[in-house]
């Protein structure tokens, strides 16, 4: 169903032109543009890392632009911080809700701006609740302002966030993946509120990857790719295939690889019926020795959650794990390591790498027992020799094994974590975003290392948000959406378009 309201086609409410933003070593945005009309829902789409969040954080005052101009109602404006954005009537509803569970609904809406009583000392609770109720009446929402937020469902908490934004007289709302944690009935209620806001002239920027939802709610869609603007089109005049083509249209790596046939190799890891709330829903897969199994999907699809669950970092509600054909119980990372499973987190500086320790101790961190002599003393020479051996094998660039890990490049830090699990004799390895934050040359080295590990019989799961990387490295690809495996692709048959189709649908398919 298409929106039944024709948005204002005159002067934009908000116009961003020529927006540029650079972070150390990365051009996040390059000559981007975006405009929002009063009384429209404008979808913003792009792959992970396309620059959507950075652009919206500039509009919300979280980041400062390095180039370009922002106009409201045709006049140039400066948005120095989130308060300035609020003063201009720009509100943002983050995917991670920013509420205090112990406070009431009304207290959350007006936190820091509570109406005061006669002498300006005490909060006027009656007026506080009355003002909140007035906003809910505008939203046609039956919600008691006195209810503690912690007692509400996620959907109701999201409504409180919207009410908070409206309390600033917001003329523009940015919604980042607003339906990620909602069921169908809750999505319908959210869409009703969005349509009401649109009818009252509020402009809404809607960030989502869910094509079926965008068909129902969006008037226009803008696509970004690699930090650049691609196109803006009316939603009624485009197709899912066209949008996906715009999202993944960058030139692929020209290097071609013929993955080895691992179909006859021993199954190293088998997962059946893995579930944890809404994050992981009946996930099952097999992983063979010598195989690189790619996990693709959009942000929030559940890939990292699966890896953490198998590694014992997060509890599960149900599921069976078999290692080399044997059923095992994994409740903690120590259990996983005991069965030869290693996990390289996407956030290596906080999980997996002791950033303040030296190279030697980081490599030996998970294998300290083997270096204990007579139950009391550490074999410092043995640790040093082992660390030096892996520094040579993995070509870790460091002046010595005594160098603090924090002084090494991202690529070399990643190699240290790999060395740690190899020293621990792990033969099943989960790599979560293995090349995030490292340069092109270091990426190539990591790719070669993964290939070498697979050739040596290691069983590898590689989670990556970069589709060219998934296509280049994987022998087989599983795609996830909303906690489910929605499809499996053989490397020879996989394309970016097929992956994106599976990453934006909710039912399982096998494409070939």
From Swiss-Prot:
It is found in: Cell inner membrane. GO terms for cellular component: plasma membrane. One of its GO terms (molecular function) is ATP binding. Its main location: membrane. Coiled coil: none annotated. It catalyses: D-ribose(out) + ATP + H2O = D-ribose(in) + ADP + phosphate + H(+); D-galactose(out) + ATP + H2O = D-galactose(in) + ADP + phosphate + H(+). Residues 14-251, 262-507 form the ABC transporter domain. It is a peripheral membrane protein. Keywords: ATP-binding, Cell inner membrane, Cell membrane, Membrane, Nucleotide-binding, Repeat, Sugar transport, Translocase, Transport. InterPro entries: AAA+_ATPase, ABC_carbohydrate_import_ATPase, ABC_transporter-like_ATP-bd, ABC_transporter-like_CS, P-loop_NTPase. The keyword Nucleotide-binding applies. It is an enzyme of class 7 (translocase). ATP binds at residues 46-53. Pfam families: ABC_tran. Its EC number is 7.5.2.11, 7.5.2.7. Gene3D superfamilies: P-loop containing nucleotide triphosphate hydrolases (3.40.50.300). Part of an ABC transporter complex involved in carbohydrate import. Could be involved in ribose, galactose and/or methyl galactoside import. Responsible for energy coupling to the transport system. Belongs to the ABC transporter superfamily. Carbohydrate importer 2 (CUT2) (TC 3.A.1.2) family. This is Putative ribose/galactose/methyl galactoside import ATP-binding protein 2.
């Amino acid at each position: 169903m298409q929106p039944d309201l024709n948005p204002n086609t005159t002067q934009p409410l908000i116009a961003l032109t020529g927006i540029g933003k650079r972070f150390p070593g990365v051009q996040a945005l390059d000559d981007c543009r975006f405009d929002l009309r009063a009384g429209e829902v404008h979808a913003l789409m792009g792959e992970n890392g396309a620059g959507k969040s950075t652009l919206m954080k500039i509009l919300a005052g979280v980041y400062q632009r390095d180039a370009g101009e922002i106009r409201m109602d045709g006049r140039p404006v400066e948005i120095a911080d989130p308060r300035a954005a609020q003063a201009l009537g720009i509100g943002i509803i983050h995917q991670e809700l920013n509420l205090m569970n112990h406070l009431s609904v009304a207290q959350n809406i007006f936190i820091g701006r509570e109406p005061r009583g006669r002498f300006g000392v005490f909060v006027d609770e009656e007026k506080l609740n009355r003002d909140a109720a007035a906003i809910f009446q505008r939203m046609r929402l039956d919600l008691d302002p006195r209810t503690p937020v912690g007692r509400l469902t996620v959907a109701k908490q999201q409504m409180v966030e919207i009410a908070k934004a409206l309390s600033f007289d917001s003329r523009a709302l940015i919604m980042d993946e607003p339906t990620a944690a909602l069921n169908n009935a809750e999505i319908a209620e959210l869409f009703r509120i969005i349509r009401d806001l649109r009818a009252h002239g509020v402009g809404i920027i809607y960030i989502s990857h869910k094509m079926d939802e965008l068909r129902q709610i969006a008037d226009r869609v803008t696509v970004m790719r690699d930090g650049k603007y691609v196109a803006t089109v009316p939603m009624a005049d485009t197709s899912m295939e066209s949008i996906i083509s715009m999202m993944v249209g960058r030139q692929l790596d020209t290097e071609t690889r013929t993955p080895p046939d691992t179909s006859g190799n021993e199954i190293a890891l088998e997962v059946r019926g893995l579930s944890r709330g809404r994050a992981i829903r009946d996930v099952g897969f097999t992983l063979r020795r010598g195989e690189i199994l790619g996990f693709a999907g959009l942000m929030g699809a559940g890939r990292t959650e699966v890896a953490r669950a198998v590694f014992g970092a997060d509890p599960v509600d149900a599921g069976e794990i078999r290692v080399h054909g044997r059923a095992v119980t994994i409740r903690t990372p120590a259990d996983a390591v005991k069965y030869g499973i290693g996990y390289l987190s996407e956030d290596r500086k906080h999980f997996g790498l002791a950033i303040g320790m030296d190279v030697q101790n980081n490599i030996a961190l998970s294998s300290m027992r083997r270096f204990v002599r007579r139950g009391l003393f550490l074999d410092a020479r043995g640790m040093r020799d082992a660390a030096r051996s892996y520094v040579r094998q993995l070509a870790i660039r460091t002046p010595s094994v005594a160098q603090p890990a924090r002084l090494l490049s991202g690529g070399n830090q990643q190699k240290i974590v790999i060395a740690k699990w190899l020293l621990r004799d792990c033969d099943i390895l989960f790599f979560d975003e293995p090349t995030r934050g490292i340069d092109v040359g270091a990426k190539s080295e990591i790719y070669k290392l993964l290939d070498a590990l697979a050739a040596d019989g290691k069983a590898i799961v590689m989670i990556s948000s970069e589709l060219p990387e998934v296509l280049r490295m994987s022998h087989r690809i599983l795609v996830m959406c909303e906690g489910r495996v929605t499809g499996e692709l053989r490397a020879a048959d996989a394309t970016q378009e097929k992956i994106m189709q599976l990453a934006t649908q909710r039912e399982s398919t096998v494409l070939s």
